[in-house]
């Protein structure tokens, strides 16, 4: 679907959870690569965020991207997004979708809403909790993991709980959007096979380092 967005000039709005910091995190690299992909198509990109300013953020003006600070829980966002009249709105992580998606839908009902997961936060948290619980059980029994560290973590992760409140929130955000970008095939399979998210609402979009220009 992203390839299909290369025809004609569109107004693209990215609503970030934080400012893009490609030198600080993989998430920052992924966001900058996505922005550069839309710029390579010739689209106009505006980056909006409610996050505080950061000395580590990339210089968006330098790559031709307008940036704006927005307020949470404020109707001024509705007025601004309506004026921008975007064709596409990208939400950086499910938390941002929860905050702004309904406002975008009200102000710009024809805009395509895309969720950029970065990764599945609920999956990462479920695996972390499972490994921690497994380690606690070993300590309580005064045993140690007999398998190598990687195998130990993999075995513990098999016991992960995928039906947490966090998972419900994240899946709800995915289902509300027209399209969700997924960076790993494992996550894609989990979404389609376990959560039964329609494949037409998902797009496998791994990190593309060639599109990162810092």
Predicted regions and their residues:
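N-terminal subdomain of nucleotide-sugar transferases
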Residues: 2-57
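Short N-terminal targeting/anchoring amphipathic segment
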Residues: 81-99, 114
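Helix-loop-beta element that forms the nucleotide-linked donor phosphate-binding surface
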Residues: 176-182, 188-209
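Conserved small/polar residues in nucleotide/adenosyl-binding loops
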Residues: 212-214
